[in-house]
């Protein structure tokens, strides 16, 4: 059975996860960041969540990954394309 301290620690870690997810979803929705930047943000959040809950990868993939994917698809700007210059016509 978990001790009172262990339960308090888990609750504190869960609050941190909620805060990270809320903040990053707001940034994706409101900042106009590029897809690349949004994906980088999500990767950093994922790493932080898994540091807080090392056995939580499956939960992350079930709960948060689809949510972040949808937000990125809906709100992130496409990355700038690369413009290739071709030589002009030969004369």
What are these regions (language model features)?
Residues 1-91:
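Surface-exposed peri-terminal alpha-helical interaction modules
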